[in-house]
Amino acid sequence: MREKLLGWATDALVKLDDEAPGILARVLTAAPSRRQAIFAALAAREEKVGVFDVGDGPFPVSFAEIIRHGRANDILRRAFGAVPDGLSGLLAQIGERPLPRPKDYIVLHDLLVDDDVRGADALRGSGRITCRKLEVLHTLDPRWRHANALERLDTGAEAMTFNKAVAFVQSVNTKASDEAVAGAIALMRPTSSLPRLLDRLLRRADRLPPHPVQQGDSEFRPLASMRDLMEAGRRYRNCLVHRMADVAAGKMAVAEYRAECLVEFRPLTRGAGWLLRDVHIERNRPVPLALIAEVEAKCDQMGVPRIDDSGDGGWKSYRRFTGELEWG
């Protein structure tokens, strides 16, 4: 039972209890701030920092007495020397049990020593401090360190993915400055999420890749802005609004043909141009073959390649005669 409550600190506390009987009982009944100060002091010895940076020698003479009778700040000063402002308060947010690894206490101490105001404020505002939160905070770009982000990211890997996602949004939205993104994170409501925040910023993208269809074509209208894409998605009642990231990244492009259908293009490798990929009508219903043929003829005229269906041995004639429809 004692090992479960005291974790890795158990052996050190048993030794200290031999020097100053009553330490174990004192730790087990101490308030969270004082108990965590003791764990932080023991972590400093475990990690050889602070006054313990000389090695694994015996505890200093007065250390056991400080642990037994001292206040939280007295214990921290005895272990680290100078105590950065706010350390005792952050330690109290850990709760009753020690963090799983001694080095996590050193990370917390160094955060304040390095004057990481954003990181410290993020921890103060995000409730109980865990090793997971420290991992997320360490991985999260310093610009996005806020309690609202810290509470919504579960792992360091997820924080890394978020960093890259923000970088992508900033690359296509000139208004998504560091200040704008940080401000949006700070203003998040309790029911909001980071994916929704990024989606809102993406919908304002204004730096899209060049479109394969030029403006001014009499039959093709390039959907070259996010507003065009969202408006077309509403009219055609399909999933186009969920493909806007693909458009912004240059992984696909969409144009409207004679206000009858949406034409999907995909990029060829090595920047060799674009390929006609598909044709869609309202609600992704089956597309009439005659309409597909018109789109293909237009793309042939523009020099846009497509999948070659020639040499079919009467297959197209059969489909045309029987009225079979192409499914989008």
Model feature map: region roles:
Residues D116-G328:
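Catalytic-core elements of nucleic-acid end-processing and repair enzymes
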Residues M1-A205:
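Sequence-structural signature of the catalytic-core scaffold of metal-dependent phosphohydrolases
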